[in-house]
C-alpha cells in the first residue's frame, strides 16, 4: 500500500505543479498592459482577449496530453505492481480487480487497441502562426473600404493576421480611403505605373497585364522582402465569412505537411446556394486552382516568381507546368463573396455566375477538428471508394427524380461534350482550364441537385486530364 500511495502522491504533485504554472503564467507572467493601451479602444481589448483565448486553448491541449501521458505511466506502474503482488500471492491468474490507492479509485489498464486504429489527431500550435493578408487594390475607394471593414470585423488578432494593402494605379481617392484605416493596415504602393506595350489587337487586355505586374510586385514584397512563410491573397471586391481566418489558420499546417498540396482557397466555383450542402465544415481537395481568397507558401512563390507571366496569371497558375499534379483545399460553402460587378471583365462573369455564390454565415471551429482526412494518403482512397461505391444512374433518372430515394448518386461522363451536357443540365460550371473542370478532383466534380449529392465522374480507370479540353 505504501508503494501505491507514493505513486498517487507523485501523480497529484505533478498535476498540481502543472496547474499552478498555468495559473501563474496567466496571472503574473504576461504582465499588465499599460493603462493607455487598455483604454485605447474596445477593438484592441477584444483582440487581446481573442489571442488569450487561443493561447489558453493551446495550453489546455498541451496540458491534456501531459495528463494522458501521466495517466498512462500510472497505469503501467500499477499494472506492474499488481503483477508482482499476484506473483507473491501464489501466482493468482486472471484480470486484476480495480484497486484503490489513497482513497482514489483506479481502473486496470484497458485491453490494447488494434494496431490499425487511427492515431490521435496531431495537435498544432495555432497561436504561434503568423499569416498576413495582402489585399490587391487599384482605383475603387468604396470597394477597398468595404473589403477592409469585412476583414477587420472578422479578424481575431492583429498580431497573428497583419493586413497589407498593395495599391496599383496611383489613384488618390483610393489611397486616401486606405489611409483612413491608419495603423490597422500597412499601405504599400506599386511603383511602376507605366503603360504596358502591347500589339494593337491586344490593347483591350492591358488591364489583365497590369494586374499580373501588380501581383508579382506585391507577392515579391510579402515573400521576398518581408520573408513571410505564408500569405493570404484577396482582392478589393471581396467580403469574407465569419470564419475566414479560422479556416486558413486550420489548413495552414496541412499545406506545410502535404507536398501534394500547393494552395488553400476560400472559394467554391460551384457554390450556388441550391448546388451545395449546408455543411460549413465540409472541405475537399481540388485539382482546379480557384483563387478568390487563397493562401500560398513562400517556398512555392520562390519557384513561381522568376517565371511569372506578363498577363492572365490565374490561367497560367492552372497550367500543368505550374500545378505539377498538386491540389488545393477548397470548401463546400465559400468563405469569400465578390461584390465587384465592374472590373477588367466588365461584369459579364459576375452577372452570369459570381453573384449567385453563397457566403458561409455560420462560424465553424476548424482548429478544433481533425483535418488529416484531407492529406492525400487518407483522402484519395476514401474519396474513390465513396464515389465509385454509390449507384450509377443516367442523367435522365437524376433530372426526372427517378433516383431521388438515393442520398448520393453517380453519373458517368465519357468525353468533353458529355461532361458539358451533364453539368449544364445540373446547373453548374461547364468549362475547363488546361483540361481541369472547376472544382474537379481526380476527374470528379460534385454538387447537390434537388437535395441529392451527385458525383459527375469518369470511368473508374480514369488516367488523367486531357489538357486540350476547354
Protein language model regions, located:
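A conserved hydrophobic helix/loop-capping motif in glycosyltransferases and polysaccharide synthases
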Residues: 132-140
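Cell-envelope/extracellular polymer assembly enzymes that use nucleotide-activated donors
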Residues: 130-132, 162
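Short, acidic, metal-binding catalytic loop of nucleotide-sugar glycosyltransferases
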Residues: 149-161
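Conserved catalytic core of nucleotide-sugar-dependent glycosyltransferases
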Residues: 241-315
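Short beta-strand-to-loop acidic/aromatic patch adjacent to the donor-nucleotide binding site
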Residues: 227-239
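N-terminal signal-anchor transmembrane helix specifying type II single-pass membrane topology
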Residues: 1-85, 102
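Active-site-proximal specificity loops/subdomain of glycosyltransferases
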Residues: 169-229
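C-terminal catalytic/acceptor-binding lobe
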Residues: 5-26, 309-470
